[in-house]
Design a protein with these regions (language model features):
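Nucleotide-activated donor-dependent transferases that construct or modify glycoconjugates
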Residues: 1-13
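A short, glycine/small-residue-rich beta-strand->loop->alpha-helix junction that serves as a flexible
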Residues: 10-20, 190-192, 198
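Donor-binding and catalytic core of enzymes assembling or modifying cell-surface/extracellular glycoconjugates
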Residues: 15, 212-305
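Short amphipathic alpha-helix
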Residues: 21-28
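A short beta-strand-loop structural module common to alpha/beta enzyme folds
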Residues: 34-45
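Short beta-strand segments
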Residues: 38-40, 180-184, 223-227
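Secretory-pathway luminal glycosyltransferase catalytic domains
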Residues: 50-219, 313-325
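Contiguous terminal or domain-adjacent regions
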Residues: 295-325
């Protein structure tokens, strides 16, 4: 009976990152036959990302929705997704958060966490499949994987939350090819002003254009752009000759994901939103393009069969999007 005690799932980052953590939690829960509870760290990535997957959880599955970050006293008026300017990772000198980054760089994090009963997945499908029944907790990096049983439960949780499920099956429009481009802008604007905190560069729209050209699409197709900044994304695509319809409702990730699920061809940037989308797009047989690496050359440790990788180019450091002022 002692192994029926819930194990803790540590999450951080935005809604899509949290969804990847939830999928890992479901997979591990089924594997070791124990329930899970979520402990969310809204400040640990250097930006503010509150718990967003609450609608998909039961009250007993939430252990802590705002776990603290050592050395940080958060302000009351933090904006979601914005850099926390007084975050320990941005301070001069050696801080606890910088110590953790050093441990990761030296590849000692797995050993340290294992000693305290925490199973560090580290973007590894083999580690996801080898979790001990006696673990106290699991932590990321979380990554996309395809498990039909997990997908079915995610679909059920979306339906229970009264949110359109991207895991639902769709019938394609006859004679119509629907291309969806996910164009992440948002926090990528701070790639160079806050290096090491808010991700990597913004994809050059020519990368998307090359894919459309390689597909050899005739006139009977439409392009829809899904973005956290749809006006900017639409303008960037127009600069290279791509006319795209934009999502009408800004800031609703769940609707964006649902729209992505209805595409025939989906072109993604390097983004956790796109990574989460891969879990339902690949399983439904959609053609999905995903970059081989970030602007910094990091290619990740996970591979997902059914994804077509492409070599993305990125907007240069001098581009105005990185310098809004």
């Amino acid at each position: 009976m002692k192994h029926k005690k819930p194990f803790i799932v540590k999450t951080a980052g935005g809604a899509a990152s949290q969804c990847l953590g939830l999928m890992a939690a479901i997979r591990v829960s089924k594997l070791i036959d124990r329930p899970f509870v979520i402990r969310h760290f809204p400040y640990s990535t250097g930006g503010y990302y509150p718990l967003a997957i609450g609608p998909f959880l039961s009250p007993e599955e939430i252990l802590e929705s705002a776990a603290p970050t050592r050395g940080l006293i958060p302000a009351d008026d933090l904006a979601v997704g914005r850099v926390i300017e007084n975050h320990p990772m941005l301070r001069k000198g050696f801080t606890y958060e910088k110590f953790l980054k050093l441990i990761r760089r030296l590849k000692l994090e797995t050993i340290g966490k294992r000693m305290r009963g925490e199973w560090y997945l580290n973007y590894s499908i083999s580690r996801l499949n080898k979790v001990s029944r006696s673990i106290k907790s699991i932590s990321g990096g979380y990554f996309p994987f395809v498990d039909e049983n997990v997908n079915k439960e995610m679909h059920s949780r979306f339906i229970h939350a009264n949110i359109d499920s991207p895991f639902a099956t769709h019938e394609d429009e006859k004679g119509q090819i629907n291309v969806v481009i996910h164009y992440r802008i948002g926090d990528k604007r701070t790639t160079y002003s806050h290096p090491g905190i808010m991700g990597d560069g913004i994809v050059d729209p020519n990368s998307f254009k090359r894919i459309l050209q390689a597909e050899g699409l005739d006139k009977n197709f439409k392009v829809q752009v899904i973005s956290d900044e749809p006006d900017v994304a639409q303008a960037l695509l127009r600069e290279v000759g791509i006319e795209a319809e934009k999502n009408s409702e800004v800031g609703d990730l769940w609707k964006d994901l649902y729209l992505m699920s209805k595409g025939n061809i989906i072109i993604c940037p390097w983004s956790t939103v796109s990574q989460f989308a891969l879990t339902f797009l690949v399983s439904s047989g959609r053609k999905v393009y995903y970059p081989t690496a970030t602007s910094e050359g990091w290619g990740g440790k996970w591979q997902l069969p059914g994804v077509t990788n492409y070599l993305a180019t990125y907007l240069p450091k001098t581009h105005s999007l990185y310098h809004p002022n």
